[in-house]
UniProtKB/Swiss-Prot annotation:
Disulfide bonds: none
Family annotation (InterPro entries): MADS-box/MEF2_TF, MEF2-like_N, TF_Kbox, TF_MADSbox, TF_MADSbox_sf
Effect of residue 122 to K: In strain: cv. Kas-0
Any one cellular-component term (Gene Ontology): nucleus
SUPFAM superfamilies documented for this protein: SRF-like (SSF55455)
Tissues in which the UniProt entry reports expression: Expressed in young flower primordia.
Effect of residue 186 to I: In strain: cv. Wassilewskija
Alphabetical UniProt keywords: Activator, Coiled coil, Developmental protein, Differentiation, DNA-binding, Flowering, Nucleus, Transcription, Transcription regulation
Function (record text): Probable transcription factor that promotes early floral meristem identity in synergy with APETALA1, FRUITFULL and LEAFY. Is required subsequently for the transition of an inflorescence meristem into a floral meristem. Seems to be partially redundant to the function of APETALA1. Positively regulates the APETALA1 and LEAFY expression.
Protein name per its UniProtKB record: Transcription factor CAULIFLOWER
Length: 255
């Protein structure tokens, strides 16, 4: 007896519904992978759970390429079906909005994956692709970091060389000034010694003039005669002052 057809309806029990979703999702992703491998077809699968969690599969390395291809194909078909320009404009805006929204959601999901979040629904191939992308990004980051470090090191080396050259120039100038000062000091000392070694000139004395200068001429020794006369007068005055009482006494005695 054949098995009867099971009616499809929403599972009311939350736990059973979650278990069924996990099983069917795994099987669906497996079937999508099988058809892409067996038939060499480009397959993309997007699934949102009742809580809004995203699950996807893409035979390409990037889901964005598949979505952009789908948008271009759908846009071309809608252009042929809807001739009205107003309807076309609304359709274009709606399609652009949907495209941008899907792209934003995809970027946000990729960002969470790069941070190591929501990795459970990803397959082995998706994890390998994510690992490869992270390794490539790390290589670029390390390369840029090494480049900046080398540039900084070269700048510091050039700065050090400039400082050393400036220091050498200042040292050379200081030595030149010291040599100039030392030379001037040596010249001054030599000049002082040469001045001290020169004999002092003696006054010239002619013998005849020397004899004339020592003669006791009243005309040539006026100051001396004046001094002698003055001294004689002083002695006379002293004698007069001293002997006057004696003379008076003798005079009285004689009388």
């Amino acid at each position: 007896m054949g098995r009867g057809r099971v009616e499809l309806k929403r599972i009311e029990n939350k736990i059973n519904r979650q278990v069924t979703f996990s099983k069917r999702r795994t099987g669906l992703l497996k079937k999508a992978q099988e058809i892409s491998v067996l038939c060499d077809a480009e397959v993309s699968l997007i699934v949102f759970s009742h809580k809004g969690k995203l699950f996807e599969y893409s035979s390409e390395s990037c889901m964005e390429k598949v979505l952009e291809r789908y948008e271009r194909y759908s846009y071309a078909e809608r252009q042929l079906i809807a001739p009205d320009s107003h309807v076309n404009a609304q359709t274009n805006w709606s399609m652009e909005y949907s495209r941008l929204k899907a792209k934003i959601e995809l970027l946000e999901r990729n960002q969470r994956h790069y941070l190591g979040e929501e990795l459970e629904p990803m397959s082995l191939k998706d994890l390998q692709n994510l690992e490869q992308q992270l390794e490539t990004a790390l290589k670029h980051i390390r390369s840029r970091k090494n480049q900046l470090m080398n540039e900084s090191l070269n700048h510091l080396q050039r700065k050090e060389k400039e400082i050393q050259e400036e220091n050498s120039m200042l040292t050379k100038q200081i030595k030149e000034r010291e040599n100039i000062l030392r030379t001037k000091q040596t010249q001054c000392e030599q000049l002082n010694r040469s001045v001290d070694d020169v004999p002092q000139p003696q006054p010239f004395q002619h013998p005849h003039l020397y004899m004339i200068a020592h003669q006791t001429s009243p005309f040539l020794n006026m100051g001396g005669l004046y001094q002698e006369e003055d001294q004689t007068a002083m002695r006379r005055n002293n004698l007069d002052l001293t002997l006057e009482p004696i003379y008076n006494y003798l005079g009285c005695y004689a009388a």
